[in-house]
Amino acid sequence: MQCSYGSIWRKWDFHVHTPYSILNNNYGFNPFELTESDLETEFDEYVKKLFTLAVENNVAAIGITDYFMLEGYKRIKEKYLSSPSKMLQCFPDDELRRKIEKIFIFPNIELRLENFVGRNANSVNYHVIFSNDITIQDIEENFLHQLTFNYDSGNTRSLTLSNIKELGSQIKNNNNDSGSDLLVGLNHVTVNYADIQKVLENNPTFRNKYLITVPVDEDLSQISWNGRDYSTRRNIYKQCHCLLTSNEKTIKWALASDREDAQIKEFGSIKPCI
């Protein structure tokens, strides 16, 4: 292969939520509560803003993110990017549309772990980013639906939307929580990081086709690695291919330029930071 240029820097945004992320929805509508006609109207506006801003800011790739599901990625992929007529309707400007069609999108599933870490016992958000080579059906059936969560008195259920809704309904009946069944269920559902790793590693479809990462707000260079949560933290960070952080001290800790061998021994690899 011949190449006439060296490295190319491209701007990627790995973590863009859609309106289906009802745990963190700042878009003014809930897709699960609208008719299909109203949802199409509202989602058209979301897609227009998403891709127009991406082009304006020269973003080359976007990680379409939702909690415990693929609904946003699925809708964007199937009803927009795979539909020339829909793309023409939303983006009549030919030049803009061509630029949008060159943007690389990939699914980012945000999960909440059942583990708590840190002085304040914070829950851990855990991202599994898949290659867009993996089909939506494979991710749903062979990854999401293979995970389980605690439902009631030691009973577990598969991680499906219908089961999450049932969990929410049960919690509302017992505790008078407000919100839709799905919202309440999503607020309470958690999964196990060892189970995630097992499902990914045991299915050859996913081999070398995913990245694991966690967002890190705190300064990892200052935390106590002798605490009770050491084993949990170590195992989670060891699974990660990279970290989502802008904390300069954490970045320095993760890159470990002054203790590379020790970092690799303890955490499996040097951790690039996004």
Segments and roles (model prediction):
Residues 1-4, 27-29, 75-244:
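Extended substrate/RNA-proximal surfaces in nucleic-acid metabolism proteins
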Residues 11-21, 67:
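Histidine-centered catalytic micro-motifs
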Residues 18-43:
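Acidic/histidine-rich helix-loop elements
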Residues 39-47, 68-72, 188-192:
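Phosphate/oxyanion-binding active-site loops and adjacent basic polyanion-contact surfaces
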Residues 47-57, 201-204, 260-265:
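Short, basic/hydrophobic alpha-helical segments
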Residues 51-70:
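Divalent metal-dependent hydrolysis catalytic cores, especially in the metallo-beta-lactamase
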Residues 226-269:
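Extended hydrophobic/aromatic segments used for targeting, binding, or gating
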Residues 274:
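Eukaryote-biased recognition of electropositive, low-complexity segments
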